[in-house]
Amino acid sequence: MQKMILENLLTPKKYNHKIRIGPKSDGGYVVSKNHLGKRLISLGCENATKFEEEYLSINQEAEVVIYDGTSSCDLASKDSRVSFHNKNVYSLSELTIDKPCMMQIDIEGSELFLLNEQLDQLKNVEQLVMEIHFHKEKYPAFPVHGSFQEWVNLFKLLNGMFSLIHIHVNDNGIVQKRPKFFGMYDLLELTYIKKDDTLEVEDRHFPLENLDYPNAFGMNPSIGWWTKQTKLLMSEK
């Protein structure tokens, strides 16, 4: 039952205007080319900024704001469009989100802690790209990973504001032999755009050719196998 609930909440919508930004490995993401905004807010970088660099190369009038309390950021000293804050963000209220923007979150297991609140602060976010970690035994300093119900509540909140258009398995979790979370791979990369109720349910499995690539170890497992079933169930309502 829990597995089916997660599948329903993580059912991508069909969207054909996707591109890959960043390397064809860890650190690259599949995003909507129509929801880039004029500002990218990146939470977590570990001084690996290929994603941010390519974002600026295709969106040259934009700016990038990076937060990371655990690393430096060489890109900020090379490009005046980039500002860096050497701090970790623990609440969305710490961010200035005052105009349409894109947000990228890779904070190694604290995403539930950050987003487990009212999401009104995200009303100006056109696109949200995030890596989620269901289990966090690798990062004991962070708050304990959330319960099943906490994740369900978060996905419901996100689905109320956004449409999920892409899902990718980060194979680092497979190699590290992390347990699945009620049937879901431990590390998932999710791409959301501003809510669009006209989008239909995706009927393809992921990965998608020429967009999805293994993160590090040559694995690219299939995901999204439940979409046809979800589409059928929705049509019967």
Roles of regions detected by a PLM:
Residues M1-N34, R39-I41, A48, E54, ...:
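Rossmann-like AdoMet/SAM-dependent catalytic core
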Residues L122-E137:
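Conserved beta-strand signature within the Rossmann-like core of class I S-adenosyl-L-methionine
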